[in-house]
Structures are given as C-alpha cells and as structure tokens.
Amino acid sequence: MVELLAPAGNLPMVEAVVRGGADAIYVGPRGWSRRRDRYELTDEDVREAIGIAHERGVKLRVAINTNMQSHEIPAMVEKMERFVGWGVDGAIMTDIGAIAEVHRRFPHLTIHASIGANILNDEDVRFYRSIGVRQVVADTKLTLKELASRKEQIDVGIEILIHANKCYTYLGKCWMSPYHRLERTTDPFGKDLFKGSPNRGGLDYRVCLEAWELYSGETRWEEAVALKNDAFFLLEDIPHLIDLGVHCLKVQGREYPVALVEDMVRFYRDLIDAYLRHPEGRPFDLTPWGAHLARIEAERNVARSDGTRLLLIEARQPVPAS
C-alpha cells in the first residue's frame, strides 16, 4: 500500500494533516531542517506531535537534513536519543556522516535519504543503502522509466515528491542563495545556523526568482530574467506511480497556511483512495480531479508568491556586522 507523507510546520498543521488523511507526517526540529525556524518545532513540540500522530495511527518522522560539522554531531545524537525514546518512527537525513552515526547508534530506526542528498543514479542509492538508508527521495528530474529501473534493481524504498519545486540546478546543491547573502549565528546549544543556506540550518532566499538582467560584456541582452524554480503538483502520474509500486508519495509545504496544506493532503488522500478502489483494467478518469487541483494550485501560487516576495526583500538587506 502506498503511503501518503504530509508536512507539518507547526502543531496545528500536525492536527490538520491527520484530519486530511496522511499516513505519515514529517516535522523539522528547530535549526536542523531545511526551513526557517518559524516552520520548525521545538523538541517538546516534536514530542507532542508524536503523541498526536500515534494516537490516530499515523507515523511521525523528523527531518534532520542539514549538513553538519563535527562539533554538531554530539548534539544531534543527543536530540535523536530523545526522539527515539519518545517513539519517533523515522529520520529524514542528508549528511552521510550523520546518517552513519545514527544508524550505528539506533540500528532499528528507519532512515530516509532526503531530497537534499540529491540522489541521481543507482550507485548513489547503493551507497546510501550501505550506510543504513532504507528509503530514498527520488530527484524530481527522474523519469518513470528510471524510477522503475531503480526499484527493480535495488532493495530500497522509493519516495516521490508529488508537490514540490523543480530547481534549475539540483535540490540540495544550489549555492546561489548563500553566495548572495549569508548570515551566521549560533543557537544556545552550539548549533551553527547559516541564514541563507538551507543546507546549514538556514533558509533559501529564492534569489533565482529575482528579476535578473542578462549581459554580455557591456551589452544587455535581456531583462527581468527569472531562473527556473517552478512549483508543481503531480496528477497524471499518480496512477502510474501507484502501479509501479512506489512506497511513498510526499507533499512538501511546511511554510504554507495550515488550511491550504490540509486541502492538499485531503485532495491526494481522496485521489489515491479513489484509484485504489477503481476496477482493475478500466481507465481511470482524472478529468474531475483537474478542476479541484486547479483551485488548490491557485491558492498555493498566491502563498508561494507572497513568500518569495518577502524572502527577496530580506535578501537585499545588509548582513549585520558581527
């Protein structure tokens, strides 16, 4: 049975996606995931979220998917000890050293390789499998044929983003935001936070969506150039992904309004269930679902545009003197 994995950037969103029909939820501990702190949870919030999810038969995973320096590993392990003690169902991670250490200390914990790991080929998957990963998030650029080949050849769960964005580079490997603006702070526990780098506990300013001017020497060739960073919803591919045997369909959106995320999750819950109920061998009509998704997409586009506008304003501010 395919799993529907939903985001939660706060406790009300945990409640909302449970109502929406999520099979599993992921949250980010403050300072350790690829979002700004307002969309992350304190440790006590994580504990409460685990309780809310488990009470309703829903799994909860923590995204600890930043890259780490050596001095941060002990604090991460201490945090994971708490989460495991509270019954967390899995960890979503990127840093290979951190993955290996978590697997060594908690061998029964399911570890998922984050989209930030930027896994592109079968050898990448085999490597992550060798250090303890049991499920990988497929890059958004992979085709259905490539996914089918990977699933057949490697004993690992496949996770697909059904609402996310397609970066003009590769998710997890873009340095444009921190190159443009990088502000370093340290939290009370010694965790480094680099505002401007989602890979280091900060945020992505989305400066690729700024209105750039294109020059060749002194000649301006084009103005108001926006690099490709499109958000998307999958619809037509959902039946094919289910038939392929993909293990998990993942919705991104911890930064969106709670009501919008609940609508997104409920839409996909209803779509998945309807497809699983329909008679095998008969065509599945996606037409009625398109209009519903168009409404959700319009609301998402407004929320994303507002968020991007505020991020770009922030990106233009000077970094405070240290």
Where are these regions (language model features)?
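As written
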Residues: G132-V133
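Conserved nucleotide-cofactor-binding alpha/beta core module
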Residues: N121-E123
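Active-site pocket-lining/capping segments in soluble small-molecule metabolic enzymes
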Residues: M1-A117, K145-K250, R254-S322
